[in-house]
């Protein structure tokens, strides 16, 4: 009779122990599932274009009241996805190709690529090539030091992307994740073959790590467990120190998993984790692209050495100083050319007109006036120019760009000189003054036009202080400075001071419109009217895009 109570007590103890074991297994499974959800959570929300595509593809006929409403709803969802009012035909075609490209990828690989949110097929190719390079590299032997722990943690995080699915759809994925040294073994087998994990004296912790790599956990590995197992002297710590150290590691666990193991710093050096808003999750998911561009220690050292050499050369070579203004130059030729500003020396002389220049490049540009060379051609209208700056100014007539803005009234201009002239309206400045009557003007051209009233042939040029006659003007230019000459229209007897103005005026009577718009065919009497009209086409084209 005494044996039966003992037997019952033993059975009760064994039952309690079994229940405790089942509870432990259940807790570990819950931890694994929670960890899986934590890894997937930051990148799970679909972004704008992807969300619109999913709504379009996921629409079903029963959701609409009838066939007409279903068709209308499909058109609306397709428009929200492809956005034809914003995207060109090429961009819409690229979106369709991207969708099909992602569809033909194997299951696990497709999920990983979609989490990176590629915006074009080229980005998908770059991601796949990067993944192949990372997984085809031979795994280095892990040293015992801190650097080996760090490298192993990062490699383990890359391997967590492989899941233990046995479907036929995942066979190409398994071939892609082939590793040279560890082969295509399961993740927990690979971990147990890493030097440092299979050594004696760590059996308890090895069993703990291996227990978390069951098929139920889908190949996920807790980063802090690997870091703790590899820490030197881990087995010498007592249980209280182990728990304290594990709690400290647990604080940094979420940040390590969410970053996919791409952070290449020790987990114990990480700052406390701050909860990020949802809009920041997308940025975290794209860290892999940025990490791929981070140079290795050797490359970083080489780049730093090159930078230091450049800085030394720049500092050491800037020893040519101008004694007049203190400006320094890297080469003596630059200092020699600069000194001519102070001395007024102009050694380069034009053989055609005798004009002199400080530099040879200025002489080359000037000689194009005599040769008629105009090497810079506008691709839009074919007009040619002798200087690149003139071409840039001209191209703004096609694009409608006006980069120069007045701070006082907000009016914009395509050229800086036009802005300077406009500023004189606000300041009231009139720097050009007539020597005959004292009248002042904002522009030099207005002064010259005014001086024709006085009929003075030796009118002083305000820019050079020389008379027009002393500058060797031609007879045709003298006709513009002589005066006043009256050019009279035979049709309406209106008179003009310039013959060119009379010719432009006569087009009103003849109806001639020689300047035609290539876009719409409309004709104009003046080029300025045509240029102003062409800007309307540019504005419409910009709005349509």
Swiss-Prot record:
Signal peptide: none annotated. One of its GO terms (molecular function) is RNA polymerase II cis-regulatory region sequence-specific DNA binding. Keywords: DNA-binding, Isopeptide bond, Metal-binding, Nucleus, Repeat, Transcription, Transcription regulation, Ubl conjugation, Zinc, Zinc-finger. The keyword Isomerase does not apply. Residues 1-22, 34-55, 455-480 are annotated as: Disordered. Residues 455-467 have a biased composition (Basic and acidic residues). May be involved in the transcriptional activation of MDM2 and EP300 genes. This is Zinc finger protein with KRAB and SCAN domains 4.
